[in-house]
Structure formats: structure tokens, C-alpha cells
Amino acid sequence: MSAASDASVPDGAPPPTAPTRRARLRFLRGGKTRTGLIILAFFVLLAVAGPWIAPYDPDAMSDQLLQPPSGDHWFGTTHTGQDVFSQILVGTRGVLVVGLLAAAIATALSVLIGVSAGFLGGAVDEILSALSNIFLVLPGLPLIIIVASFVPDTGDLVIAVAIALTSWAWGSRILRAQTLSLRRRDYVEAARATGESTPRIILFEILPNLTAVIASGFVGTVIFAVLTEITLAFIGVADISHWNWGTVLFWAQSNQALAQGAWWWFVPAGLCIALLGTALALINFGIDEFVNPRLRTATGSSRKVRMRVGFTPVARKAPGTGHPGQYSSKEPRT
């Protein structure tokens, strides 16, 4: 009996937690996820080190007006001789700070309101759902423009808070719907039966099952916040003395860079916006593939060998034998 049990569990077998660890690392194995994380890490590095590695002061003027890219000015210069490359480097920090801060505040609000409404139910659900519906129907960008116009200093913090307050409602509705489907699960009922408190049930039973939804909402909010901040800077609502990619585009458009043929003034900022948006979208796609098994199955099914149409395996006599012993797919069924 002991020999059989020893044989059933080999010495070199991995611990029971190995499949769980592999499942957790599956998210990082995807090509989309890795590509998105590499691009995002590059921009984070620029945001951290940009002001120190910038070759020039982004506000410093010179006599080299509207010069194309060269060894001295990699991205060319503006109409006042300012270095575009230095402006892009310094502006990267403002873009990521506003995007990440706004997404963090909006995600915290959506988790707090959505999960509380879905789990508690009753009057709490009705009040919080009504609050979410009010913010859903409010036009986000016009409201941000109005708020920014009444604030004397529209810095990164003000813009991030304004974006967060107008972008949490849709995530809250999604989390409420997911929580409604989770609160009657067997493990949640078992936690209630053992006397667990409501905050502990939410923290240890509900939120771990909403991690992927929360992460996807966070990435989506970062994309929305980045585009909103750049839009506000481009139309001149945000403080144009704070450098970001939208500020670069604002000055390029105000001084008719396109009409003057100064493509180097606006193309680098546009490419940075496209690359950052692509990176965040790839990360979001990776989260979807990690959460949705159907997407992983569809990706893997493309590698399967397809049967030849019109031919089916039939039995053939093996050489030297008098009975069918081999199969062939070269003969059509008669």
C-alpha cells in the first residue's frame, strides 16, 4: 500500500502551488503584454530621467530658428529657437503623472462605490447607483474645461483630480454588476456563515475576483486621462507654462508649423502619443486574453492541423497480412 502511494507521487513532482504560479505568470508571457510593458517602461524611464537628461532648457531661446533635426538638435527647433527634443523629454513626466494619478483616483472611487453598492444592496445600492448615473450623463470634457477655467492655477494636480471626478462612474457600474454576481457565491455564503465581517468578506472574497476587471479599468482610465490632458493643453485650457506633449502641439499649431513646413515641431509629440496609447492598449488586450479563456483558446486553435476536405481515413491491408492493419487518408471513401 505504501509502495503504491509512493509510486503515485514521484520525488521530482512540483509543489501544488506550481500551477498557480504558472497561471499568475501567464499574463506576462503574452507577446502583446510584454510589448506594451516594454514601451510603457521606456516612457516611465523618460518621465523619471527626462528633466535631467534633456540637453537644453525647454524654455531657453536661441538664434537657431525653425531648424530641422540635426546633431545639435535631434528633433529640431521652434520659431524661437527652443529645442523640441528637450520639450518632449520634460513633457513626458507631466503626461504620465496626470494619467496615472487620475487613473488611481478614479479607480479608487469606482471600487469603493461600485463594490459597496453591489455587495450591500438596498438603500445604499439605490443611492450610490443614482450618484453613478448622475456622473454618467454629465459631459466629461466640457465639465473639465469649466472647472479648469475657474481655477487660477490649472497644474497637473488640478487637471488629474478634474479628470478623475468625471471618469469613475462607468467603472463603478461595471464593478457593481460583477459584485452582484459574486455576492451569492458559495464561498461568500460560507464566509458569512462563519461570522466574517463585511469589510473582511469584501477584501478577501470579493476584491480578489475583481482584480482583472479593476486592472482593465485602470488602464482604460489612464488612456482617457492622457488624451484628455493633451486635449486640454492643445486647446489652451490647461496651463501652457507646464510642459507636456499637448503644450508642444499647442505652440506648433499657434505658430502655423504645418504651413511653414516645420514637421519636426509636431510629429515627435504625435508619435509619442500614438506609441503610449498603443502600449496601454496592448496591455489591456493582454489582460483580456488572461481573463477570457475563449481568447486564449482561439489563439491556440489557429495552430491546429486541419483535416483535408473530401478525404477520410479508411482501413487498408498491411503489407504481408490478410487483414486491415493500416489507415490511409489518401483514398476517398467509396
Language-model segments: which ranges?
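N-terminal signal-anchor/first transmembrane alpha helix
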Residues: 3, 11-59, 131, 200, ...
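Glycine-rich helix-loop "coupling/hinge" segments at transmembrane-helix boundaries
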Residues: 136, 147-151, 179, 220-221, ...
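Transmembrane alpha-helices
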Residues: 93-109, 199-231
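C-terminal transmembrane helix and the adjacent membrane-cytosol boundary/short C-terminal tail
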Residues: 166, 212-215, 219-220, 262-329
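Short membrane-interfacial helix/loop motifs at transmembrane-helix boundaries
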Residues: 24, 48-86
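Generic hydrophobic transmembrane alpha-helix motif, especially the helices
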Residues: 74, 105-109, 118-185, 213-215
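Transmembrane alpha-helix signature in integral membrane proteins
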Residues: 84-119, 275-276
